[in-house]
Curated annotation (Swiss-Prot):
<dbReference type="GO" id="GO:0046872">
    <property type="term" value="F:metal ion binding"/>
</dbReference>
<keyword id="KW-0411">Iron-sulfur</keyword>
<dbReference type="GO" id="GO:0051539">
    <property type="term" value="F:4 iron, 4 sulfur cluster binding"/>
</dbReference>
<keyword id="KW-0479">Metal-binding</keyword>
<feature type="binding site">
    <location>
        <position position="314"/>
    </location>
    <ligand>
        <name>[4Fe-4S] cluster 1</name>
    </ligand>
</feature>
<dbReference type="GO" id="GO:0005737">
    <property type="term" value="C:cytoplasm"/>
</dbReference>
<feature type="binding site">
    <location>
        <position position="85"/>
    </location>
    <ligand>
        <name>[4Fe-4S] cluster 1</name>
    </ligand>
</feature>
<keyword id="KW-0808">Transferase</keyword>
<comment type="pathway">
    <text>Protein modification; protein lipoylation via endogenous pathway; protein N(6)-(lipoyl)lysine from octanoyl-[acyl-carrier-protein]: step 2/2.</text>
</comment>
<dbReference type="InterPro" id="IPR007197">
    <property type="entry name" value="rSAM"/>
</dbReference>
<feature type="domain" description="Radical SAM core">
    <location>
        <begin position="85"/>
        <end position="303"/>
    </location>
</feature>
<dbReference type="InterPro" id="IPR013785">
    <property type="entry name" value="Aldolase_TIM"/>
</dbReference>
<dbReference type="GO" id="GO:0016992">
    <property type="term" value="F:lipoate synthase activity"/>
</dbReference>
<dbReference type="InterPro" id="IPR003698">
    <property type="entry name" value="Lipoyl_synth"/>
</dbReference>
<dbReference type="InterPro" id="IPR031691">
    <property type="entry name" value="LIAS_N"/>
</dbReference>
<feature type="binding site">
    <location>
        <position position="104"/>
    </location>
    <ligand>
        <name>[4Fe-4S] cluster 2</name>
    </ligand>
</feature>
<dbReference type="Pfam" id="PF16881">
    <property type="entry name" value="LIAS_N"/>
</dbReference>
Length: 326
């Protein structure tokens, strides 16, 4: 399936403030593609989410996060499952600020020149995890192409501080690709490897130029393969979105590539456009197709596959890890 609503254009020459956090149209105005909306597809009946309410832990979690000056990808990326996850007392923590150095047009995380790293963040994160008595946490980050190590050292500090205060808590990290710094980053991560190493491929290679400008499909596969070679006992994990214009066979081919690179855990979920400025949804995948992807995943040898319309990379990550034997 082609993507006719994504066309080339020259970068915007409008003045902008690189220090400000840019979202939606402001964020995407300077990438070398223009996102044009075609027909807006009606959401099918199987797309349903729960909103947080005052009777859940939703606001309690938000207050604790603000108190410790922390961000969650749940909030920054406008995850549709935020109500359910916050209500269950779980969250995916996003470290190194809330401004990403990339401008992926599917993602709702803000772009801008990042602030200096907060030296207190690792301890604040550890205190928050301890206060919430979390048994399984996911730590992710914005891309930090401005840092010589891509932020890997900060990941290590967060893991170490968390294990000091919560030694029984299992830690999954969802990392950027450490573009051009992968060997350095992997060497640094040796000091405190996580319990699960996650890096998302996001989409099929044909759509990388539109959906993941600045990223490389093979580079991402190799990052996980190299990590697995260094830490054979640590499960590796990756995730895909469907609905950007890919075909079912392209998804299956990516799954085969994942297994060929030693990736053991898989997530596949429906892409939902955060705004009209983002890449449009080209199709809503039927539950039967998700079921087919799941069945094929286990045939290929994945230890665990979380596949469904509302599945996200860190959605029920604890249950995914435990089902995979972590």
């Amino acid at each position: 399936m082609s993507t006719p609503d994504v066309v080339r254009e020259a970068q915007s020459t409008e003045a902008y403030n690189p220090l400000a956090k840019q979202k939606a149209a402001a964020k995407l105005s300077r990438i070398p593609i223009k996102v044009e909306q075609g027909e807006v597809l009606k959401k099918p009946e199987w797309i349903r989410v729960k909103a947080g309410s005052p009777t859940t832990r939703f606001y309690e979690i938000k207050n604790i996060l603000r108190e410790h000056k922390l961000h969650t990808v749940c909030e920054e990326a406008s995850c549709p499952n935020i109500g359910e996850c916050f209500g269950r007392g779980t969250a995916t923590f996003m470290i190194m600020g809330d401004k990403c150095t990339r401008r992926c047009p599917f993602c709702d995380v803000g772009h801008g020149r990042p602030d200096p790293l907060d030296k207190d963040e690792p301890l604040n994160l550890a205190k928050t995890i301890a206060a919430l008595r979390l048994k399984y946490v996911v730590i992710t980050s914005v891309d930090r192409d401005d840092l010589r190590d891509g932020g890997s050292g900060h990941f290590v500090e967060c893991i170490q501080r968390t294990r000091e205060l919560s030694p029984s808590t299992q830690i999954e990290i969802l990392t950027p690709d450490f573009r051009g710094r992968d060997d350095r980053a992997l060497e640094i991560l040796k000091a405190a490897p996580p319990d699960v190493m996650n890096h998302n491929l996001e989409t099929v290679p044909r759509l990388y130029k539109e959906a993941r400008p600045g990223s490389d499909y093979q580079f991402s596969l190799n990052l996980l393969k190299k990590f697995k070679q260094l830490h054979p006992g640590v499960p590796t994990k990756s995730g895909l979105m469907v609905g950007l214009g890919e075909t079912d066979e392209e998804i299956l081919e990516v799954m085969r590539d994942m297994r060929a690179h030693g990736i053991e855990m898989l997530t596949i979920g429906q892409y939902l456009a955060p705004s009209n400025s983002h890449l449009p949804v080209r199709r809503y995948v039927h539950p039967d197709t998700f079921k087919m992807f799941e069945e094929e995943a286990y045939k290929m040898g994945f230890s665990h596959a979380a596949v469904g319309a509302m599945v996200r990379s860190s959605y029920h990550a604890d249950q995914q890890a435990h089902a995979a034997g972590v």
